[in-house]
A protein has these predicted regions:
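The feature encodes the CheY-like receiver
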Residues: 58, 86
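Short amphipathic alpha-helix used as the core "switch/output" element in two-component signaling
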Residues: 63-74
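Active-site beta3 strand of CheY-like receiver
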Residues: 46-52, 57
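Acidic catalytic/metal-coordinating carboxylates
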Residues: 35-38, 61-64
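Two-component/phosphorelay signaling modules centered on CheY-like receiver
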Residues: 11-31
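C-terminal output helix
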Residues: 88, 106-115
């Protein structure tokens, strides 16, 4: 099973993603972070396979977290999960190292489909 870290300032969103992934029986949630600093620290400490990340956090933007993680050579697959759906933002996130981008709101099926795709790329 692949290890997943959830980075989102919304407790509801973290719980929703966690529940969806755990109920799939395919993923282990190794940690949750509500800020960018926590997300970076946990990514370095826990070495997750996949990171779900909100793009707008209280202390920094998800895109800046991605840049920091890639600079630190964290090779986890990163899926941005954000209410911001502007194509220019999506492209900027991908150019900075995001592997996928899912716009909120989304269905549980869409989340699992995207995470499954990233997990396959790890094999």
């Amino acid at each position: 099973m692949k290890k997943v870290l959830i980075v989102d300032d919304s407790l509801f969103m973290r719980q929703s993603i966690k529940s969806t992934l755990m109920n799939s029986g395919k993923y282990i949630i190794v940690g949750e972070a509500a800020t960018g600093d926590q997300g970076i620290e946990l990514s370095l400490d826990l070495q997750p396979d996949i990171i779900t990340m909100d793009n707008i956090l209280p202390d920094m933007l998800g895109i800046d977290i991605i840049k920091e993680l890639r600079k630190e050579e964290v090779m986890a697959k990163i899926i941005m999960v954000s209410a911001v759906g502007q194509e220019s933002i999506i492209q900027e996130c991908r150019a900075s190292g995001a592997d996928d981008y899912l716009v909120k709101p989304f269905s549980n099926e869409s989340l699992i489909e995207r995470i499954d795709k990233l997990a396959l790329e790890l094999n």
